[in-house]
Amino acid sequence: MYFAIRLSFVLAVLICLTGNGSARMLDADRNRLQQLQIRSQQSADANTQVDIAYEVIGIYDKYKGQGGSNVLREAQLNSQVNDFKRKTMVIDGVPAQGGVWGILGAIKKAADAVPDNVKKDAENLVKSSTKVLVRGIYDYLMGKMKH
């Protein structure tokens, strides 16, 4: 009997510690998402935008598919994330199948041949599409983390 009481006490403590750890992780991820969203809105650099997007995607991957998920919205976000990853994937410094980096790389290599307004338009496209992705994931996760 003494062993059963002691074991139940130990299990109760472990459950409390695990729950508290999850709450801290949730708070940390929520705070990090807020920081990344602010940085995304303030940054004017395409490379920084892509780095921010990958970090936000990492947080999204931790929480997608969990209880209270909106299956339709997650399917849309998953499609956007996969499209983004496909277009920005770099393997050994080389863009996979062109993508965004192929566009930017081609622009950088042929900098003298490409007008400045075309270079600027390509960078603006990268920045705006990345901001839209970050904002979509941010809005979804912040709504989900309130519960």
Swiss-Prot record:
**Record's signal peptide:** 1-23
Q: What induces it?
A: By a variety of stressful conditions such as bacterial infection, heat shock, paraquat feeding and exposure to ultraviolet light.
**Could you confirm whether the keyword Isomerase appears in this record?**
no
Provide the alphabetized UniProt keywords: Immunity, Innate immunity, Secreted, Signal
* Entry superkingdom: Eukaryota
Compartment list: Secreted
Q: Where does this chain mainly localize?
A: secreted
Q: From its record, what is one biological process in GO terms?
A: cellular response to UV
Its GO CC terms? extracellular region; extracellular space
Q: Does the keyword Nucleotide-binding apply?
A: no
Report the function annotation for this chain.
A humoral factor that may play a role in stress tolerance.
Family from the record: Belongs to the Turandot family.
Protein name per its UniProtKB record: Protein Turandot Z
User: What is the organism field in this record?
Assistant: Drosophila melanogaster
Gene that this sequence comes from:
TotZ
